[in-house]
Amino acid sequence: MFFSRTLSFTLVALLVVCLSQKAHANVEQKSQSPETRLMQCPLPEFDDIAIGIPEVVDSTIRISSSQASIQQDQIALFNGSVILVDKGQKIIADQLSFNRLKMQIEAIGNIHYQGKQINIFADKLSASKIDKSTEMTAASYQLDGNPGHGKAGKLSINSDGMMSLVDSTFTTCLQEVPDWQIKASEINLSAKGDFGEAYHAQFRVLDVPVFYVPYFSFPISKERLTGFLYPELSTSSSLGIEFTAPFYWNIAENYDATITPRYMSERGTQLQTEFRYLMDQQSGKIDLEYLNKDKKIKTNDDPRYLARFQHIGTFSEDFRAYIDYTTISDDNYLVDIGSKQYNSNDAYLYQIGELAYFGEQWQATLQLQDFEVLGDHQSSYKTLPHLELSAQQPLNFLSGQFELYSEMTNFQPSEKDQVSANRYHVEAGFTFPITRPSWFLNSEVKLMHTYYQQDNISAGSSLEETVDRTLPKVRIHAGVNFDRQLLAFGQSYRHTLEPQLQYLYVPDEDQSNIGLYDTTILQDDFHGIFRDTRYSGLDRIAAANQFTWGITSRLLDEENLEIIRVSLGRIQYLGENNTDLANDALLTDNGGIDNKQSSVAADLFYRINHQWQVSGDIQYNTLEDFTNKGQVNLDYQINKYNLIQLNHRYTRNVSGDSLEQASLLTSIAINENWAFVGRLTQDLQQDRSLESYAGFQYESCCWAVRIAYQRHINSNLDAASFVSEGREQFDTGISIKLIIKGLDGKQSAIGTQEMFDKSIFGYKRPYYLQN
């Protein structure tokens, strides 16, 4: 069923693409660069107004004009194309006078003042060399390298470079009638041009007053400044009306915090805080989300919260530390409240602390790890602690290497009635990797010994208190690379044929007396069939006496860009695989193997042209004629602003049920102002929508707005103590976000990636292991 549906899906996709696009061999034009789709917002540029006049490095003033005269031996008068150059400033005017005794400059007519951070045009200028101040009237100004500009009845610059604008305006809109502007009795701009302050300010839209504030400060540059960030308004059936107003606190150069009150009409008011720190070779952040009382929870008054601590640091060239710890009040917090830390469909929270040493020949890792499992998913074991030691020593023959790996792990269960265990493992052996341009031969022989000490074993269990397991492993993996030049469709290609063969031997041993602590079955895709184990962890080491064959063929163009890749492979068993999996429900391979051979694993990639590409993989059981797993993807991408991704995937027997889903994701830059992002995810087995998301964004050079609609299925992970009233099967909502460019230091809008992130499934860029 899946195989035919997937084949039809692929053929239809290819037909649509081929009808609308030329074949790859006939396409010469490459995709547009991302810049061709960007909105152009050119900033006013001003040339040096004193070209040809040397710069001043001391207190000297240089003046050039058409005419000059001196009055009373103290006032110098200049007329016609006057240019004054002083330290840090330059002035053009029709007329200018300089009083030598008062050290005063007066200028009138077509004044252009050019400072380090600003260009000003005015009718009149007065400057004092004594107190190093400048004052202009009827002025208009333009910040340098910034769209910020405006007008002022009077503009003053003090000795520190701080600008004070009386009866003034500020905007980042370049048109004659700006979409928005601040009109204030006074605006102060810092000397560095990084922030501004407005007093008795009106915020105007199309020159119509919208609201009034007695005072507010705003960043102009990208420097981090304390103040409110943009609020966001949304609605949903679960939260009601939601409003967030983040406040950014620039505590110090290497510390900052964001404090966000989050009002939810159906739940209450939540406080979100994020604290970040950056030190020498150390960085991290602490996130806390706290809701004192959820109005929808009637069973108790307990608070609902999420806390997360992340840290990464190095202590020298050899030592590294890593921490990621999250705790949560209840299993359904992410579903009911939502969080920026995790998606609402996440089933567990990561909790890990790690200290690692990396030497030239020795490596060591000490790790504490746990997973906080949400809902009725299979509980996991804590590793308290997990210690790894590994070493490598080159040999003097056959490019060989001696390798040693050992670990000690203490497994602590989540439930009191579960088995606990200590596991000690060591494996040592020799590897001989030989790699040449046209072939490779990798061989290894190792001896693996594992010791288990298991406690709290229930009566009637097949587990034993102590278990010793010693197994050898032999692995030989070889491959050959053939290539030839191929002329097709009038173009030259390089065609490769890459067969490979692997032999793996591990003797059979009954392991049903060992519990499952960190072991699960791994993917048997094309790359997975060449692994030396079928399982993660060490609780099961599958018996193997098998050959794995595989072949890959590629077509590459003259730029060595991969056009087509086809891979096919399978495991052939020389003897029966008797590793006892009868009681290991988690390790069931869903019919992926029989006593003679595994499922066929295939992988396909086809770059139709520079914009379109198709990829897919499948694991197909030829003996019983069914598909274990498979997926197919169709990707169209001109640049990060224009893309389409169509995906279909199938997995047989996931938790007793098959999974089959199809999804469509698209991002379209309609023009330089409008963009659209949409996503649809459909459960084909249950014939229901899992998620619908549509977002429109309008962006101009000085403001942007995003309006989005989302509807997604709700999980239900309720514990008895947190039963939410009125939880619907689907959560539906609308959100709106407005950005006034230039009032937060950013010159770009929200971006399509942020809209993708709002989707519970997100966007996965095409990734190809062999590309």
UniProtKB/Swiss-Prot annotation:
GO cellular component: cell outer membrane; transporter complex
Keywords for this protein: Cell outer membrane, Membrane, Signal
Claim: Ribonucleoprotein is one of the keywords in the record: no
InterPro entries, alphabetized: LipoPS_assembly_LptD, LptD, LptD_C, OstA-like_N
Subcellular location: Cell outer membrane
GO biological process: Gram-negative-bacterium-type cell outer membrane assembly; lipopolysaccharide transport
Signal peptide segment: 1-25
Function: Together with LptE, is involved in the assembly of lipopolysaccharide (LPS) at the surface of the outer membrane.
Family: Belongs to the LptD family.
Subunit organization: Component of the lipopolysaccharide transport and assembly complex. Interacts with LptE and LptA.
Name of the protein in its database record: LPS-assembly protein LptD
Name of the coding gene: lptD
